[in-house]
Structure formats: structure tokens, C-alpha cells
UniProtKB/Swiss-Prot annotation:
GO terms for biological process: aerobic respiration. NDH-1 shuttles electrons from NADH, via FMN and iron-sulfur (Fe-S) centers, to quinones in the respiratory chain. The immediate electron acceptor for the enzyme in this species is believed to be ubiquinone. Couples the redox reaction to proton translocation (for every two electrons transferred, four hydrogen ions are translocated across the cytoplasmic membrane), and thus conserves the redox energy in a proton gradient. This subunit may bind ubiquinone. The lineage of its organism: Bacteria, Pseudomonadati, Pseudomonadota, Gammaproteobacteria, Candidatus Pseudothioglobaceae. Keywords: Cell inner membrane, Cell membrane, Membrane, NAD, Quinone, Translocase, Transmembrane, Transmembrane helix, Ubiquinone. It is a multi-pass membrane protein. It comes from Vesicomyosocius okutanii subsp. Calyptogena okutanii (strain HA). This is NADH-quinone oxidoreductase subunit H.
């Protein structure tokens, strides 16, 4: 909160004629821009990292032509997509066709408003920030469903139907998985959940909730349409799914939304199960002092990078699951395990097993 108060004072000093409400709106707007620009850069270079990592896993070099070692490849890709023509299918509903990418990208950006990067670095600190993330994050699928419907083509429609079914299935699993975290932390505030895990790696929730952490990670792959669960846009089955009729910047917007959601799920995994911005060496006498100079945000970024690498590793090593296998995994495997683990956590809470309860 000290950083927030300092920021407020700076704005009032620069523009003293602003009243309190306008100043707060201006501050939130500035913080939103400060978050949006780095997020788009991270998304752009995550695509570069993906191509490089998967290339090395397949004994290839990956992008290496544009700029030194291919570092300018994301910029070249962006310019290419910006200059491509946007083609509208003959029988498409043009208004809904253009609205769909907006519905996909808007929630993917809006949900970052409540994500804390450190104890005092966030846009807003909602008491119900976890519920906000679940509510806003689930809206993005309507963009995919609308894209499938508005394209007036059979392959996008099949992709939209799959997307709707997967949303219903895995939103329930993710919701039940996060209930266990809320039961231990006693709050739905993301900041409070992270603070409850301070004290070192032994206090992090991935230890008592290890099966739930695995389920959450796999479910996040499904929710973000990532391989091996990318049946919504399976090229070998439905050509490209909901994206097949999109081109140029309309396609790029869907692309940005998918990768922004991937980064979001990686950050959520860190916040929920791996102590957020806390160092793993807290309360360890010698190591705590050695690593005390590293800011909390750096720890958060390092843990998030690890999960983002896991996304790439899974994509490069596992074949695509069939649609019926994914549904079976949700309803007959993950859902029963999460329900059972809720009762296990309730029992451990009553027994007050230290150090988590």
C-alpha cells in the first residue's frame, strides 16, 4: 500500500487541480497502460520462445533469420498480420464475426486488473479477486463460441460446440480445485492467499494439495486450448476450428487472447500453490540472507517462467487427446478427485495439521 500512496501523492503533485475521484481514475488508467504494454510484449516474445524451445526439442534451430538469433521474429510476425487483408466469409454475420475477437481478448486483459505481482504492486485489490478471475475469465469462451456461430461454416461450428462442452466440464473442476485453496487460506483475496504461504517453501500449498495442483495445471491446458487438449482447433480433425475463417488482425487477436490466458494461468498456479512472490528460502537462516536482495516480483516471474516452460514441454511431447477422452478425464477422473480432496482438506483443517492448517 505504500507504493500506492506514493503514486497517489505523485499524481496529485503533478495535477493538483484534479479531485479525488478523477485522480483515482487517472491512476488506474496509467497502471492499466503500464500493465498492458509489457503484457503484449511478453505475449509476443513468448511465441518466439515457444518456437525456439520446441525447435530444440525436435533437434531444430527455430527462428534465426530476422535479427540476431531471430530476436526480431515477433515484430516481423506482427507486421505481417497487420498488413494482411481481413477476409469475410460470404454467408457470415459480419457484426458478430468482428465482435467475437473482442469478446475473446477483453476478458483476457481485464482479468489482470486484480493479479498482484507483489505485496503492493497491482491495479486494484478486490476482496473477492479470486471470484473476479473465475467470473471474468470464463467470459472469453463466448468469443470462441460466437466466432464459430458467426462464421456460418461447419468446421468453426464444431469447434464452438467443443469449446462450450469443455468450458462446462473444466470450469467445474477448476472451481472445486480452488475451493481447497480457499479452505486453507480462509480468503478469496489473491493477496491474502499469497500472504498465507509466507515462511518458506514448506508453507506453500503445493505440498498438502499436490494432486489438486496437478489437476489444476492439466485443466488450465484445457481451458486455454493448448496441446494436447487443443481439440477446439484440431487441425487434423476440424481443419482449424473456430479460427479457420479468420485472417489478419482478427486472427491475431484470438492468438493474443490465447497466450495472455496461458500466462494468466501460469501466474495463478504460482499464486495458488507456489507462494506467489515469496522466496523459497524464507526462514532458512543462511539462505534467507543470501537471497534477500531479490525482489518479490522477480521470484514471481521466475516461477511463472517455469510453468510457461511446462506448457511448451507438454505441447512438444504429448500427442493430442481425443475429444471423448478429454471429457472422460474431466467427469470421471478429475471431478471425483477434487470432491474427495475437499473432504480431505476439511478433515485436515479440523485436525489443524501444521504448518498449513
Amino acid at each position: 500500500m505504500e507504493l500506492w500512496q506514493t503514486f497517489v501523492k505523485m499524481v496529485h503533485a503533478l495535477v493538483p487541480w484534479l479531485d479525488g475521484t478523477v485522480a483515482i481514475i487517472l491512476i488506474i488508467f496509467i497502471k492499466a497502460i503500464a500493465l498492458l504494454i509489457p503484457l503484449m510484449l511478453v505475449v509476443a516474445y513468448f511465441t518466439y520462445a515457444e518456437r525456439k524451445v520446441i525447435g530444440y526439442m525436435q533437434l531444430r534451430i527455430g527462428p534465426n533469420r530476422v535479427g540476431p538469433k531471430g530476436w526480431l521474429q515477433p515484430i516481423a510476425d506482427a507486421l505481417k498480420l497487420m498488413t494482411k487483408e481481413i477476409i469475410f466469409p460470404t454467408k457470415a454475420n459480419i457484426y458478430l464475426f468482428l465482435l467475437a475477437p473482442v469478446l475473446a481478448i477483453a476478458p483476457a486483459i481485464a482479468v489482470w486488473a486484480v493479479i498482484p505481482f507483489d505485496e503492493s504492486i497491482y491495479i486494484t485489490n478486490l476482496d473477492i479477486s479470486l471470484l473476479y478471475v473465475l467470473a471474468i475469465g470464463s467470459i472469453g469462451v463466448y468469443g470462441i463460441i460466437l466466432a464459430g456461430w458467426a462464421s456460418n461454416s461447419k468446421y468453426p461450428l464444431l469447434g464452438a460446440l467443443r469449446s462450450a462442452a469443455l468450458l462446462v466440464s473444466y470450469e467445474i473442476v477448476i472451481g472445486f480445485a480452488l475451493v481447497t485453496v480457499v479452505m486453507i487460506a480462509g480468503s478469496v483475496n489473491l493477496n491474502t492467499i499469497v500472504q498465507a504461504q509466507q515462511g518458506g517453501i514448506i508453507y506453500w500449498y503445493f505440498i498438502p494439495l499436490f494432486p489438486i495442483m496437478i489437476i489444476f495445471f492439466i485443466s488450465s491446458l484445457v481451458e486455454t486450448n493448448r496441446a494436447p487438449f487443443d481439440v477446439v482447433e484440431g487441425e487434423s480433425e476440424i481443419v482449424g476450428g473456430t479460427h479457420v475463417e479468420y485472417s489478419g488482425m482478427t486472427f491475431a487477436v484470438f492468438f493474443l487472447a490465447e497466450y495472455a490466458n496461458m500466462i494468466l494461468m501460469a501466474v495463478l498456479s504460482v499464486i495458488m500453490f507456489f507462494g506467489g512472490w515469496h522466496s523459497p528460502f524464507e526462514a532458512i537462516p543462511y539462505l534467507e540472507s543470501v537471497f534477500s536482495w531479490i525482489p518479490g516480483m522477480i521470484w514471481l516471474l521466475a516461477k511463472t517462467t517455469f510453468f510457461m516452460f511446462l506448457y511448451l514441454w507438454v505441447r512438444a511431447t504429448f500427442p493430442r487427446f481425443r475429444y471423448d477422452q478429454i471429457m472422460h478425464l474431466s467427469w470421471k477422473v478429475f471431478l471425483p478427485i477434487t470432491i474427495i480432496w475437499i473432504f480431505v482438506v476439511a478433515l485436515m483443517t479440523q485436525l489443524q495439521l501444521s504448518p498449513w492448517f
